[in-house]
Amino acid sequence: MVDFRKFYKENANVAYTVLGYPNLQTSEAFLQRLDQSPIDILELGVAYSDPIADGEIIADAAKIALDQGVDIHSVFELLARIKTKKALVFMVYYNLIFSYGLEKFVKKAKSLGICALIVPELSFEESDDLIKECERYNIALITLVSVTTPKERVKKLVKHAKGFIYLLASIGITGTKSVEEAILQDKVKEIRSFTNLPIFVGFGIQNNQDVKRMRKVADGVIVGTSIVKCFKQGNLDIIMKDIEEIFKK
């Protein structure tokens, strides 16, 4: 199983993008320049018609991608043309994986250099079949923990976790306000008592100020909505500068 610590030094810069937004050409050009960016780990969002975990900005970006005909097949074709030293993670809804076929999807993802899957609406209790395939192909199925998750459940969730722990720093959908820092610190401490895996904080982290604050709390910071916003105007040089600004030390 991949050790995500090898992709960063002190703290991981984790970004999220919707593949196909504003179009596949921009996504491909961005991925070709990924190694020149401060991003250590990139979550690749696969557009889905019913994105229950996503806020308005990400949901709108997914709709634009879908309206242009972006699907899992065009995503796979795009990734087959990409070479990068950075870690690539799929953020994908379970229905897409299920429709494609669990083993077929995981095997294909592995062949394209994907290190891990984040499946936001898949509960721990329903994840056995996908875990089996991920273990077979040495891909991490990422465990999500919320600040509101009770301690006993945290223990259960992280016991067999792989890759990293995704700590949800806000309650609800993406792009909302982050919870108090002290609450997060307590949650990180609690999670650390059960696992040695790195803990990355996401949901509600919007700017460089937030990033700097969260670096003191966890092993890495995940920025989603603000990164997706960078892509709206479509100019790659501006996108790269905006991303530099979000993750600057």
Curated annotation (Swiss-Prot):
Q: Does the keyword Amino-acid biosynthesis apply?
A: yes
Report which reactions are catalysed by this protein.
(1S,2R)-1-C-(indol-3-yl)glycerol 3-phosphate + L-serine = D-glyceraldehyde 3-phosphate + L-tryptophan + H2O
Pfam families xref list: Trp_syntA (PF00290)
Which GO molecular function terms does the record list?
tryptophan synthase activity
Q: Which residues form the active site?
A: 43 (proton acceptor), 54 (proton acceptor)
Query: Which of the seven top EC classes does this enzyme belong to?
Result: lyase
Keywords (alphabetical) are:
Amino-acid biosynthesis, Aromatic amino acid biosynthesis, Lyase, Tryptophan biosynthesis
InterPro entries (UniProt xref): Aldolase_TIM, RibuloseP-bd_barrel, Trp_synthase_alpha_AS, Trp_synthase_suA
Pathway per the UniProt entry: Amino-acid biosynthesis; L-tryptophan biosynthesis; L-tryptophan from chorismate: step 5/5
Which CDD domains does the protein's record reference? Tryptophan_synthase_alpha
Q: State the family it belongs to.
A: Belongs to the TrpA family.
Question: What is the protein named?
Answer: Tryptophan synthase alpha chain
Q: Which organism is it from?
A: Campylobacter jejuni subsp. jejuni serotype O:2 (strain ATCC 700819 / NCTC 11168)
